[in-house]
Every structure is written in structure tokens, then in C-alpha cells.
Amino acid sequence: MIYDFVPFHLVAEEIAKNLENHYDDVDLKDDYGRPNLDWDSYLQLSLAGRCRVVTVRDEERLVGYSCFCISNNLNHKGVIEAANTGIFIDKEYRGKITLELIRKSDEYLKAIGVIEAIYILNDDRIGALLRRAKYKAKHTVWSNQYDSISFTAT
């Protein structure tokens, strides 16, 4: 497997081609329905050096990725955080490379000065892998969904 840490805009087209299939492959879906990424914001963040992706390739084929938006913690000046906005592993590679993807992500993020990586997930299997990678449940996420959610593609 070949791991790399690249700006989002360098792999955006590749991720876009596979996004619908990735959504279909995921067992647990969120309440929002099919993805409708804000590509402009992702690309702007990427060009500003604030959105990066750890990729996993089997030769040339993209078989996994983990995307992070990187920012300064507004309550603790000088603390750089990386929020995971998406993690995906091709079905045939699950259970084989996910833990290594998490560990490689940690290495790459530490190398650019990130102090804390944050994953917000609704999948206990990935949570179990994060625990194996020395993550701990640290923050409680509370959510209040107002009325029904209906989005229109823009």
C-alpha cells in the first residue's frame, strides 16, 4: 500500500468520481441523505493549506482516504486541530488497512504541527480502531436537528 498526505484539491476529482459509491458502501448513514459536498469551500480551504487528505493506494488505485480540515482552536490560541470530515476504505480492504490509515494520518498531522485530531463518527467499528490507535472518547457531541432536513443541490 502507498500512503500519501496531499492537499484536497489534488485528489478532489478522484474522490468526486467515487463519492456516490462510497456512500452506498457505508453501512451507517447520517440523517442528511446522499452527500452534497460544498466543493468550493473544500477547494478554498485546500488552496489555503487548511484541507488535506491522507490517501491509500494499491498501486495507482485509490482504495482509501481520510480527509481533514485544519484550523486554530479559537479558545486556545496556538493549538492547531484537525477535524476529520470523512474516512473511507474500499470494502475489499476493510479490516486490513483502516488502522494503518489512522496511524499514518496521525504521523502526517503531527509533522505539520497539529496538536489534536478529532473524529466525529456514528460507526462503533471505527471507534474501536481509534481506541487501538490510542484515541479516547474525549468530547460529548450533542445534536438538535431542527424540523426535517431537506436540501436542494446547488
Outline where the language-model segments fall.
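Conserved active-site alpha-helix within GNAT-family acetyltransferase domains
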Residues: 121-140, 150-152
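Conserved GNAT acetyl-CoA-binding A-motif
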Residues: 110-121
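A short beta-loop-alpha structural element at the N-terminal edge
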Residues: 1-19
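Conserved beta-strand in the GNAT
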Residues: 55, 61-70
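A short, internal acetyl-CoA/4′-phosphopantetheine-binding micro-motif in the GNAT/acyltransferase core
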Residues: 83-95
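Conserved acetyl-CoA-binding loop-helix of GNAT-fold acetyltransferases
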Residues: 94-107
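Conserved GNAT-fold acetyl-CoA-binding loop/helix
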Residues: 23-42
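A short helix-loop-beta-strand connector motif used in the catalytic cores of GNAT acetyltransferases and
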Residues: 43-55
